[in-house]
UniProtKB/Swiss-Prot annotation:
It is found in: Cytoplasm, Nucleoid. This is Nucleoid-associated protein EbfC. Keywords: Cytoplasm, DNA-binding. Binds to DNA and alters its conformation. May be involved in regulation of gene expression, nucleoid organization and DNA protection. Belongs to the YbaB/EbfC family. The lineage of its organism: Bacteria, Pseudomonadati, Spirochaetota, Spirochaetia, Spirochaetales.
Length: 99
């Protein structure tokens, strides 16, 4: 079966429009990664930019350096996972298979 080049171009235009819409939706995403019962929280946007890091000072004095570094790493990884999940949910069914 032959592919009509005009149909292909129409589909590409639709894909570009979908990608533009996804980019807009991604810019609206904000998640909060947490670690250590909220001792460390990291706010991240849909483009994986860290917007805010919060440390509960009440517990900070009791932490050693290794524990604190582990909590920051865990909170950051939690935020990244949440952004990926939001992107997955927002793009489900929007992009053609394989993109």
């Amino acid at each position: 079966m032959a592919v009509n080049p005009l149909d292909f171009l129409k589909n590409m235009s639709s894909v570009k429009s979908n990608i533009d819409n996804i980019k807009k939706e991604m810019s609206k995403i904000t998640v909060c990664g947490k670690a250590g019962s909220n001792i460390v929280t990291i706010e991240m946007d849909g483009e994986f930019n860290v917007k805010k890091v919060s440390i509960n000072k009440e517990f900070f004095d009791d932490l050693d350096n290794d524990a604190f570094e582990q909590m920051v790493k865990s909170a950051l990884n939690d935020a990244v996972s949440k952004v990926k999940e939001e992107i997955k949910l927002k793009t489900m069914g929007v992009l053609p298979f394989g993109m």
